Amino acid sequence: MRIGYVCKYVPVEALEAIGAHMERIEADESLVSFDAAESCMHANVCSFAKATFETVLSGNLDGIVLTTCCDSMRRLADALHAQAPNLFIHVLDVPRDTGEAACALYQRRVAELLSAYGKFANATFSEKKLFAQLGGTLCPEEGNCDSSLELDYARLHSEAAQPSFRLAKSSSVSQSFTNSNQAADSAAWSEGCEASERNADETVAVPQVNCTLQPQTHFSPAMPNVGIAGARANAEIKRILETHGVNIAFDITCTNASRRFVPQKADTLAHYTHDVLTQLPCARMRDISPRKAFFDRVLPQIDGLVYHTVQFCDMYSYEYGDLKRTSPAPILALETDCTAQSRGQMLTRLEAFLESIGASQKEHLASQKGSSMSKTATFVVGLDSGSTSTNAVVMNEAREIVASVVIRTGAKAGASAERAYREVLERAGITPDQVACTIATGYGRVSIPFADENVTEISCHGRGAHYFNPAVRTILDIGGQDSKAIHVNAAGEVTDFAMNDKCAAGTGRFLEMIARSLEISLDELGPAALESKKHLEIASMCSVFAESEVISLIANNEEKPDIAAGVCRAVAGKAYSLMRRVGLEGAYMMTGGVAQNPGVVRAVEELIGEKLFICEDPEIVGATGAALLALEKSE
């Protein structure tokens, strides 16, 4: 039978020993909505729980084993019991401690799980089967010596309930380390274990965390090394990293696949459950000092850390905050909602992060077209394919902008890019043969086949802002459907960034919607806000609710300039929160189409207490950065 699981504390090997075919559940990459889940679960239950619900109800599994790792998993179990009563649904209550009493309790609960599954599947568990499942072998004369190892559930419950139950110290697992990384892990874990013992109740002997069960680490001297941590991460994150020439040094997310348990012939189940419970602790465990020790060891050795979280999950936010303050390695906070729509946002963030740490080694189209790039050509082109506008810049060898165009993005990003390309070449008075290199950026960058390379808008805006004003350190870019804050160093290199591309609030589309409600043009909205005489607050951050709030203000006969000013302040407040996440450091620059809205500009300046630098055409900053990168590539 096919049984799913979502947590590393599930006794996968024991269930496989009893005949279950265990499948680690990840977010279905084809999933586009949570229609079934949201019909019987609260909207704010974490996205992974909803995705798991959809996966189980798809009919490909005979059951699932959940754990009490969080309230969302408990609510998921309730919903599954109601909607799929014929499936095997078991919630394993995992202790938050790892002391001897906790190990005994966990062993008893695993026994209850095995008993329940045995009845469901008409199967019988034995420690001999578990020993074999873990890789243990018996010599021929021992072939039948374990026939008495059928699990006595009543005896196990009785023993586990006694305070005197102990796991013999002489039977603790031992294994030689195969490399220096594992040895270093052992030292780090031992340090963490000692801290755990010092903090524990002295009347209870707390066993050390099993130092042989280390997360697998692999550091490559020839490739950028990036680690993955946090909540459950799907395979797409790894695929993107590996496609960009990155070595994944470690993966310690919830459902990482690193399971290495050493079989013990005596008391096989007791040793096994002890080992499962004393893995590298997750963030829900009482003592996470071994986890901190692991980070202390590996973070100085990697180029960056991708810290994954799931929408509406707050389990790992505290650890991320601590690592963000103390980590010697750059960290990317990556939140996904476990749907296929997350891929574009995930790709942009990961590529921008890799570019910022100098770790991106993409297989660009340029590598296939290298011979077609003319060494005698003297111009380069930068193309910024955004949601609202497509912008193009032609630059010469002297780093001078020869021509630029801004056109409306149509239904096809590729077609709009081709039109912008033709128009900018016409304005520059040159032919395609005179273009040495074309680099595309923006959300539509992957849909421009004639570009030699594509680079994220994060890197391009950083480079473009530095071109227009080298003193700029913090950039605010508000586009048609996203907004981002970028911090750059003195060389124009991105050091940190934060994005909002999951919600229309605080973007150009939001302002368009409000202008339509006020029956004025978008160009009139900003100047109208400057004429405000009354302070109005738009409380809702959601674009839909904000529009309803604006309609209510109109019904109350409030003046259009006052409403416009309130909307501009709401947009500025959302932008300011992004800027604070990357660090407020002057000089400040604003780019994107919204930089032409004087109402929003004034509201942002009031919040930061400083003037914003805005270039003559703020919409071409990204395309200018792309052209600069193209110039570097063609040299």
Language model region names:
Residues 410-413, 490-534:
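Glycine-rich phosphate-binding loop plus the immediately following alpha-helix
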Residues 511, 615-635:
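Glycine-rich phosphate-binding/hydrolytic loop that grips phosphoryl groups
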Residues 443, 580, 584-607, 618-622:
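Glycine-rich phosphate-binding loops at beta-strand->alpha-helix junctions
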Residues 329-336, 457-458, 605-624:
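Conserved phosphate-binding/catalytic loops in two-lobed NTP-binding clefts
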Residues 6-27, 229-294:
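Redox- and metal-dependent alpha/beta enzyme cores, enriched for Fe-S-associated oxidoreductases
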Residues 368-375, 443-491, 576, 625-632:
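Conserved phosphate-binding catalytic cores of ATP/NTP-utilizing and phosphoryl-transfer enzymes
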Residues 375-457, 596, 605-606, 610-612:
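N-terminal glycine/serine-rich phosphate-binding loop of ATP-dependent small-molecule kinases
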Residues 546-579, 619:
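Adenine-nucleotide phosphate-binding core of ATP-dependent small-molecule kinases
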